[in-house]
Amino acid sequence: MAMRQTPLTCSGHTRPVVDLAFSGITPYGYFLISACKDGKPMLRQGDTGDWIGTFLGHKGAVWGATLNKDATKAATAAADFTAKVWDAVSGDELMTLAHKHIVKTVDFTQDSNYLLTGGQDKLLRIYDLNKPEAEPKEISGHTSGIKKALWCSDDKQILSADDKTVRLWDHATMTEVKSLNFNMSVSSMEYIPEGEILVITYGRSIAFHSAVSLEPIKSFEAPATINSASLHPEKEFLVAGGEDFKLYKYDYNSGEELESYKGHFGPIHCVRFSPDGELYASGSEDGTLRLWQTVVGKTYGLWKCVLPEEDSGELAKPKIGFPETAEEELEEIASENSDSIYSSTPEVKA
């Protein structure tokens, strides 16, 4: 019997979820951060969606959010003309980086020493986080607001996207290496370090390019306008979501559509695979995050393949606020399937 995809629904946000990012895999699992127009980015356990805490301090919509590799720091980009860096264990704000316009995107270097930002003022900024009083380095060249900016090639290069252009920059010389022009607005961009692959979405197209040369690799066409796409870590699958409220799963090698799912009640703004490839997360206009299994029916996280009569139907209650100490934090995130906040029983039934 075919297994039914049952996503885990993560509630808590009150406005559209516009960005999300996973950390790397740490000794305590991996983590997920979400950016929302409610101005309150949230941190969750990545494999279960369990809420850990909310970063409080922005005074406007948060457009971008990211975690460093070991999930000790978070960074957010917001409409209040600031980017903020946070202690992801305590939830404390570490620094506020003032900008001249709305900030849309943030990204840490691999060693977490530098933060890249971009936004409506068309400038890329590089902040030395060990010298918070120092002025950032600035890169100009974009002709419209920057939507996404990412470190690539072991932080030697930078990828950035504005409305209809993707640009590749050399970090050392701060100069443009190459650019790609599109005939419609670029909606998202993802960088895959293994293989140096760049995933770009625009209109109904999902395009793959070399992140080193920007040369095209392949492209797919989706049935609807796509806002975001993500490539599986093993490059087996691609998932994409957009304006028709659906998530599409493709075979990366053949381009064949394998499955499509409808669970959100609004357009999907962001989708990303987890670092282990076992699930992917989606964020929507409906204000929720949903976690989806890559292989439906596999026991993983809160999913357990059970028969209907084995389901107890019990749900746990959520916690509120960051733990008071790092020790409490580690105890919480190390506990299996800690407090759940789901509106329906998270399981896959045979």
Curated annotation (Swiss-Prot):
Subunit structure, per the record? Part of the core SMN complex that contains SMN1, GEMIN2/SIP1, DDX20/GEMIN3, GEMIN4, GEMIN5, GEMIN6, GEMIN7, GEMIN8 and STRAP/UNRIP. Part of the SMN-Sm complex that contains SMN1, GEMIN2/SIP1, DDX20/GEMIN3, GEMIN4, GEMIN5, GEMIN6, GEMIN7, GEMIN8, STRAP/UNRIP and the Sm proteins SNRPB, SNRPD1, SNRPD2, SNRPD3, SNRPE, SNRPF and SNRPG. Interacts directly with GEMIN6 and GEMIN7. Associates with the SMN complex in the cytoplasm but not in the nucleus. Also interacts with CSDE1/UNR and MAWBP. Interacts with PDPK1. Interacts with TRIM48.
Biological process terms in GO annotation: alternative mRNA splicing, via spliceosome; maintenance of gastrointestinal epithelium; negative regulation of transcription by RNA polymerase II; negative regulation of transforming growth factor beta receptor signaling pathway; neuron differentiation; protein-RNA complex assembly; spliceosomal snRNP assembly
Cell membrane as a keyword?
no
User: What name is this protein filed under?
Assistant: Serine-threonine kinase receptor-associated protein
Q: Which GO terms describe its molecular function?
A: mRNA binding; signaling receptor binding; U2 snRNP binding
Where, in residue numbers, are the WD repeats?
12-56, 57-96, 98-137, 141-179, 180-212, 221-262, 263-302
Q: Which residues carry this modification: Phosphoserine?
A: S312, S335, S338
Cite the Gene3D superfamilies for this sequence.
YVTN repeat-like/Quinoprotein amine dehydrogenase
Q: What is its main location?
A: cytoplasm
Q: What does this protein do?
A: The SMN complex catalyzes the assembly of small nuclear ribonucleoproteins (snRNPs), the building blocks of the spliceosome, and thereby plays an important role in the splicing of cellular pre-mRNAs. Most spliceosomal snRNPs contain a common set of Sm proteins SNRPB, SNRPD1, SNRPD2, SNRPD3, SNRPE, SNRPF and SNRPG that assemble in a heptameric protein ring on the Sm site of the small nuclear RNA to form the core snRNP (Sm core).
The entry's family comment says: Belongs to the WD repeat STRAP family.
A GO cellular component annotated for this chain's UniProt record is: SMN-Sm protein complex
- Which residues lie in Polar residues bias regions? 337-350
Q: Where in the cell is it found?
A: Cytoplasm; Nucleus
Q: Which organism is it from?
A: Mus musculus (Mouse)
Signal peptide annotation: none
Q: Which UniProt keywords apply?
A: Cytoplasm, mRNA processing, mRNA splicing, Nucleus, Phosphoprotein, Repeat, WD repeat
Phosphotyrosine: which positions carry it? Answer: Y342
- Region of interest (Disordered), residue spans: 326-350
Source domain of life: Eukaryota
A Pfam family of the record is WD40
Instruction: Respond yes or no to whether keyword Phosphoprotein is given for this record.
Output: yes
